[in-house]
């Protein structure tokens, strides 16, 4: 069986066994508070993992958004998922950037929108699985002024963890927190999916506290 087949089979099998307690959560959710809502003090941009539905997914994105609002105030945070050309398909995981350029561009568009629509907002970001590669590559592509407005980033099941040496190249390491669960082989530069890769919902509160500390500092 090829590595690609293992990746697809692993996702299919483990998705059925994922510990998501609610059917609604399994279906994923979307948040477009930057695109459709008023400017808020903090904007959280998130890219979901492969095959997750909605633009926030269900494994960890909605949890970080909810916890961040609890920490900072629901009227202070706008949550925005990366959608559009980023359709979270499986195949782009096998490309050199662990995603495709169209998906990276979809994320950079969200950073650009936050900057132009809400110039005073503090930007934080996160990504899970393929979404971690989307955010990683997007932040590298930002110009220096916009990159400086990104106050903190959290990455879960970081597919480029080995390649990028546990950081986002060109972005401050102390503003980045990477979550790689014990037994998550994706963090070891493989695309083999284990149960550990679906465990990051448990880290949502901690990730939100990290991001909150960066915008409050």
UniProtKB/Swiss-Prot annotation:
It catalyses: cutin + H2O = cutin monomers. Its EC number is 3.1.1.74. This is Probable cutinase 3. Its main location: secreted. Pfam families: Cutinase (PF01083). Residues 1-17 form the signal peptide. The keyword Hydrolase applies. GO terms for cellular component: extracellular region. GO terms for biological process: carbohydrate catabolic process. It comes from Neosartorya fischeri (strain ATCC 1020 / DSM 3700 / CBS 544.65 / FGSC A1164 / JCM 1740 / NRRL 181 / WB 181) (Aspergillus fischerianus). Belongs to the cutinase family. GO terms for molecular function: cutinase activity.
